[in-house]
Design a protein with these regions (language model features):
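S-adenosyl-L-methionine
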Residues: 54-86, 91
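Conserved SAM-binding loop of SAM-dependent methyltransferases across substrates and taxa
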Residues: 35-46
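Conserved class I S-adenosyl-L-methionine
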Residues: 25-34
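Class I SAM-dependent transferase core
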Residues: 1-23, 61-64
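C-terminal substrate-binding/active-site "lid" region of AdoMet-derived donor-dependent transferases
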Residues: 108-161
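A short, conserved alpha-helix within the catalytic core of class I
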Residues: 99-107
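Core SAM-dependent methyltransferase catalytic element
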Residues: 155-173
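Conserved SAM-binding motif I beta-strand of class I
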Residues: 48-53
Length: 173
């Protein structure tokens, strides 16, 4: 299935998950789960994962990607999900920018230990940084540019993938 905005490139996912710092026994959330590839990787360590997306195609794709894993897949707005009763979320990955400031606020208020936002737009990265700073949870931001090799006339050349901003927040409360 082709889900707009995904899947997250493996190299970007590796750095994002390192920053997220999922621990054994954690309850995690992939908010704006897209294809479910990040959800699947988080589920390898976390004891339980919420995967939330408002797009029907994303939910369908995540169900396929995460079959048999400890993942609860929810179709709907992230802010609606966070506003209703759920297990306390230890770490959250945000792959989408819909209602970003409100989502970050809800996660910070809940006491989510670690939050990672991936953004391809500068404006989204700025909003994430500004919101995290206002909430007192901003840790750091990365601008990641990855290039992959490919063969060209029996030689090796590199082709860049789109750069990504990785914004990390930690809640010490």
């Amino acid at each position: 299935m082709n889900v707009p905005g995904g899947p997250t490139p493996a190299e970007v996912m590796a750095v994002s998950l390192l920053k997220l710092g999922v621990r054994s026994g954690d309850v995690a959330a992939d908010l704006g789960c897209g294809t479910g590839t990040v959800t699947r990787e988080i589920a390898k360590t976390a004891s339980y994962v919420y995967a939330v997306d408002a797009r029907e195609i994303a939910v369908s794709c995540t169900k396929e990607t995460c079959a048999g894993l400890p993942v609860e897949i929810i179709e709907g707005e992230v802010t609606d999900f966070l506003s209703r009763p759920h297990r306390k979320i230890d770490c959250a990955f945000l792959g989408g920018s819909r209602n970003l400031a409100e989502t970050l606020t809800l996660l910070a208020e809940e006491g989510t230990r670690s939050i990672v936002v991936n953004a391809v737009l500068l404006e989204t990265a700025c909003l994430a940084i500004e919101t995290m700073k206002r909430l007192g949870i901003f840790s750091d931001a990365l601008h990641l540019q990855v290039s992959r090799s490919y063969e060209l006339t029996k030689r090796t050349m590199f082709k860049p993938i789109n750069p990504v901003y990785i914004i990390h927040g930690e809640n010490t409360c």
